Amino acid sequence: MMILSKARCVELLEMPIETINGDWRFKASPHVTTRGVTEGVALLHMNSVRVVPGKGVVSRVDRANDFLSFLYHDISRISAGTCEPRESMLAVILPIDKVEEYVAKFRRVEPFTMGGFREACRALKFSAAVGTIFDRIMKDIFNRSPTLAMDGIPPLAKGLCFVLKSRGITPIRGGLLVGEIPKACGDHCPKCGAQYATRKSRFVTEIDLVGFDSTDNTCVLIEVKTYKNSVLPIAVLKKYNTQTWINWFLFGLMYPHLRQYTKSLIAVVSPAGRVVQLFNVRSPPITRRMISAFPFLGEYCPQMRRMMTAAAMTYVIKAPFVAAHVTGTDNVSIEVFSQSNKLPPNKWATDDAARREMERTRKARYRAKNRAVADPEDSPPGKRLRRGPKSST
């Protein structure tokens, strides 16, 4: 088995099965229409997101927006002269020129109330713009853009780079286009080699960052997400996991020679809490709903689907394996931590006897509470409520 080196990884990334142009169309088949994966992921997670025409995907869970709440108070203090734009919440995630541009736009909102501020954010598509600008900064860093100035890198971008470097991950490329390749596995089995009906469109997506992990000699696909609150709900994390896994699967179709040497991560950046978190990507259950949203998944046998994302064999969403807290704007301080040294351990994790006793106590209290509030008239016919032992007197 080959041991992948960074130079070999860079060389193999230049040899996709098909080339995708900048307009997201296949170079060999420009007449074939393409589509992204965002709407399909939204259909799979309709309980947590919904698609609004003209606005994109809107979250149904975690309606609060700490980022906008903090920013509203920062703009108020800037207008009062007690705060500078570089001291605001925006300076944590955006370069200073963009901070001054948005601060000037928000200061023109009349009357400046929370409702008016949120309406201005919706009109500017502010949340999506912040995520797009941050993604572009990270892609410029990974592409070593000559136009990127060091003073234009915001603190959270420095924090993400520091976390990746601490895990042995170095940049290779930013903004890698991958797409659906029909019959990418040949005649692996009757299912993989069958002739399927040609669909009108093919899926194409962009992998935000591609790096190389020197600790295990693997190619790392990184999906960058910006989130409005400090705590990431499990429903949102599952949606991120599904989208990133689909991107990983399409990468396996496009680059079969790197398939077994690849893993994927989700990098979640939260400006409200100044936190950067990395999550491992796991394979979601392949259901009929997922195949209806992404039909190419149904054209491969379970073994080949596992081979596409070999490092994601089990579906487990866990706490971040590494994270960092970023403080300061000019002099940035980064504290890297993991769940093992940041969160207190569960005291029942190793004491089985104490855990069983706690469970018995909880069930006994639950039964006693139900007996106390139960009404005999509401009891089912033929069923008598439990009563305490009769007194000997």
Swiss-Prot record:
Region of interest (Disordered), residue spans: 345-393
Basic and acidic residues composition-biased segments: 349-361
Biased segments, Basic residues type: 383-393
Source superkingdom: Viruses
Name of protein: Uncharacterized protein ORF60
